[in-house]
């Protein structure tokens, strides 16, 4: 205390945010944050990297909602001391954080590092022994959704012998995995991926009917349809929040669900089942090829992340950033000698052709095709259906609350929860990419004995942990398990729906990975190659939908933070880079949708169904509400307790404080141009104009 200060007066706690280990730095040629990205993302196709290199010299100011001096003083006085904030969500200051950013790149842009760094030794969990993890878990951390278990209980058994040609989804073309043609002999490829044995397990019409049912869902929270439906009212779409933010206006929710279906399931079904008459078997061939390409990319990206620092351009700060992120990432590839088919080259591009472009489109909606789901066995079919249903419902709920023409209607509690959801989705997607890379390597190299291959076939590991990973449960608990998260869930209808969607993806991925381990067999059970292949493809379907849902969340985060001026959205320090790595690896499976394109698609869908956004509330008699309280009951077992107390997400950082990183990594050129035009007062291309009267 200063000698001039009167006795008894305490100095006000500083609200200046703390520093973060990673932050923005103006980029140059191989310098700073972009230098690190070059080391990870370099490859034959540099189009995405070139988009990342676009940087404005000066950051545009964030357009914030106006507030008077009294409101500013009140907000400053209510800010908690930094020491009382949750350690994993601390906010870094731009200046302090910038001093810790790094520069550097690897010497050879074409060579994949093939040294034996320690990160590539060990099993599925890297240097951590899976048996040691099982000893620490003590019990199962896999808690499937009660709604999923109820749906699974009423699902009838498979009846492949009774499915006729007219019920099996149409003609079947010869299956193939294009990326492996000429590299793997036909008999070996058919043994690894017996696509010719993937006959429909149920009739397509039966699966179509079941997708339209949703046990336990009350009126207003509709299940996935199989075609566009006319339950929503046309005309004005009201975005004002109800007096009780724990509920939705039923009319607006129905309109949001209609928009969600037009940009996801209806889009993919229109392009495949109706226009081109593509068969589900063709979709499965694409999926198998995409998963193999994804496995190659996952191996390459993981190898570069763990590459030893070498070359004069890599300084101590660059090596430190690489070490920090490498210690957190789930991408821990096995040695090149164990997987020669994955490590033979660099990153691979997506499959060419119009069919592949369609399968990768529509926000990852291939699992909304009943004919594709009918090719899966019972548990995986229900898991894919349930994940599709809940992410569809969450997309509809987001579109009922977020719109470029009604940003001021978004509540702070809704914006704050979005970053937590994105954190979990990024970790879950990263772990799934790693799992697919390992299991594909195991399928293609059946005579190689590697600890990672043994781990992914270890049933007890996947029975104890979702995706067999302590990082997944750690991220879930860190983002969604603290007191603040539970309060956000209980006090917002949108947050409850988003939490249920994350839980559904957790349940689906935990189910298919456990079923894969069972299909691998052991000394007491026969190995089932066809069942194992079905489970790999089911994981690919769920991952594709997860990525589409994550892009939807990113679009809403950018809208709230950059267009609405909200400071509430926070993400883990490494979430943008983690998700960007995932998007790079999954290009063969999923064509990402930038925020600008997402909102352009939403606007086109709204015009198609004649919806006009307004910042008002509906009047009687259409002002009824829908309460998602049933989802809060479903969420009671989630998230499970973590295995350890360490942080998976890293320190929390406000999205507005890492604007250039977020923009370069996740928004793309079009989104950056839209933001630049918007903050300068011009209409933001891709973000929509003023609402129509």
UniProtKB/Swiss-Prot annotation:
GO terms for biological process: regulation of DNA-templated transcription. Residues 50-75 are annotated as: RNA-binding. The keyword NADP does not apply. One of its GO terms (cellular component) is viral tegument. Phosphorylated by US3. This phosphorylation is required for proper nuclear localization. The keyword RNA-binding applies. Keywords: Host cytoplasm, Host nucleus, Late protein, RNA-binding, Transcription, Transcription regulation, Virion, Virion tegument. Residues 48-57 have a biased composition (Acidic residues). InterPro entries: Herpes_UL47 (IPR005029). A motif (Nuclear export signal) lies at residues 647-670. A motif (Nuclear localization signal) lies at residues 63-75. It is found in: Virion tegument; Host nucleus; Host cytoplasm. It holds the Pfam family Herpes_UL47. Its main location: virion. GO terms for molecular function: RNA binding. Residues 63-75 have a biased composition (Basic residues). Interacts with US3 kinase. Interacts with UL31 and UL34; these interactions seem important for efficient virion nuclear egress. Interacts with UL41/VHS. The nuclear export signal is CRM1-dependent. Belongs to the alphaherpesvirinae HHV-1 UL47 family. Tegument protein that can bind to various RNA transcripts. Plays a role in the attenuation of selective viral and cellular mRNA degradation by modulating the activity of host shutoff RNase UL41/VHS. Also plays a role in the primary envelopment of virions in the perinuclear space, probably by interacting with two nuclear egress proteins UL31 and UL34. This is Tegument protein UL47. It comes from Human herpesvirus 1 (strain F) (HHV-1).
């Amino acid at each position: 205390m200063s000698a001039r200060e009167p006795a008894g007066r305490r100095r006000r706690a500083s609200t200046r945010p703390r520093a973060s280990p990673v932050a923005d730095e103006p980029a140059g040629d191989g310098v700073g944050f972009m230098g690190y990205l070059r080391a990870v993302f370099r490859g034959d196709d540099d189009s995405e990297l070139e988009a990342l290199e676009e940087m404005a010299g000066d950051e545009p100011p964030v357009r914030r909602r106006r507030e008077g001096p009294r409101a500013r003083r009140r907000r400053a006085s209510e800010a908690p001391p930094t020491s009382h904030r949750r350690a994993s969500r601390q906010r870094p200051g731009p200046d302090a954080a910038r001093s810790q950013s790094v520069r550097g790149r690897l010497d050879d842009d074409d060579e994949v590092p093939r040294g034996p760094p320690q990160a590539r030794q060990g099993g599925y969990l890297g240097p951590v022994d899976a048996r040691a993890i099982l000893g620490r878990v003590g019990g199962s951390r896999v808690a499937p959704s009660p709604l999923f278990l109820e749906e699974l209980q009423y699902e009838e058994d498979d009846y492949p012998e009774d499915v006729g040609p007219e019920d099996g989804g149409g003609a079947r073309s010869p299956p193939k995995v294009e990326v492996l043609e000429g590299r793997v002999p036909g008999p070996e490829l058919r043994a690894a991926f017996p696509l010719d044995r993937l006959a429909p397990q149920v009739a397509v019409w039966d699966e179509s009917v079941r997708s339209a049912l949703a046990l336990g869902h009350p009126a207003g929270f509709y299940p996935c349809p199989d075609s566009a439906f006319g339950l929503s009212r046309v005309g004005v779409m009201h975005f004002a929040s109800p007096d009780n933010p724990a509920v939705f206006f039923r009319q607006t929710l129905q309109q949001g669900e209609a928009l969600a279906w037009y940009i996801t399931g209806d889009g993919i079904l229109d392009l495949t089942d109706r226009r081109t008459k593509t068969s589900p078997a063709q979709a499965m061939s694409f999926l198998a090829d995409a998963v193999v390409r994804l496995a190659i990319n996952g191996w390459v990206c993981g190898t570069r992340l763990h590459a030893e620092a070498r070359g004069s351009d890599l300084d101590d700060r660059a090596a430190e950033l690489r070490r920090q992120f490498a210690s957190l990432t789930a991408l821990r590839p096995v040695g090149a000698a164990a997987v020669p088919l994955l490590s033979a080259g660099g990153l691979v591009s997506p499959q060419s052709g119009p069919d592949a472009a369609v399968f990768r489109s529509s926000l990852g909606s291939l699992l909304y095709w009943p004919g594709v789901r009918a090719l899966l066995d019972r548990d995986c079919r229900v898991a894919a259906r349930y994940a599709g249903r809940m992410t569809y419902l969450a997309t509809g709920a987001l579109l009922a609350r977020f719109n470029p023409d009604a940003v001021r209607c978004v509540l702070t509690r809704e914006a704050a929860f979005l970053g937590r959801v994105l954190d979990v989705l990024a970790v879950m997607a990263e772990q799934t990419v790693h799992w697919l890379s390992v299991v594909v390597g195991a399928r293609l190299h059946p005579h190689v004995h590697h600890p990672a291959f043994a781990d992914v076939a270890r049933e007890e590991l996947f029975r104890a942990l979702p995706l067999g990973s302590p990082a997944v449960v750690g991220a879930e608990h860190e983002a969604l398990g603290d007191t603040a998260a539970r309060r956000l869930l209980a006090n917002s209808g949108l947050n409850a729906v988003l939490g249920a969607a994350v839980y559904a993806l957790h349940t689906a991925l935990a189910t298919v990975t456990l079923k894969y381990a069972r299909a691998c067999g052991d000394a007491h059970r026969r190995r089932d190659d066809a069942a194992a292949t079905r489970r790999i493809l089911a994981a690919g379907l769920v991952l594709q939908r997860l990525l589409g849902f994550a892009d939807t969340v990113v679009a809403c985060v950018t809208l709230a933070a950059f267009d609405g001026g909200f400071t509430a959205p926070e993400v883990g320090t490494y979430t943008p880079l983690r998700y960007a790595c995932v998007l790079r690896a999954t290009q063969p499976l999923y064509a990402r949708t930038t925020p600008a394109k997402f909102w352009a698609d939403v606007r086109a869908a709204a015009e198609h169904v004649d919806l006009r956004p307004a910042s008002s509330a509906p009047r009687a008699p259409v002002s009824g509400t829908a309460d998602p309280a049933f989802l809060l009951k479903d969420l009671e077992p989630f998230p499970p307790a973590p295995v350890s107390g360490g942080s998976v997400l890293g320190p929390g950082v406000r999205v507005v404080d890492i604007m250039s990183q977020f923009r370069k990594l996740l928004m793309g050129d079009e989104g950056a141009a839209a933001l630049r035009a918007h903050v300068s007062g011009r209409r933001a291309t891709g973000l929509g104009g003023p609402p129509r009267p």
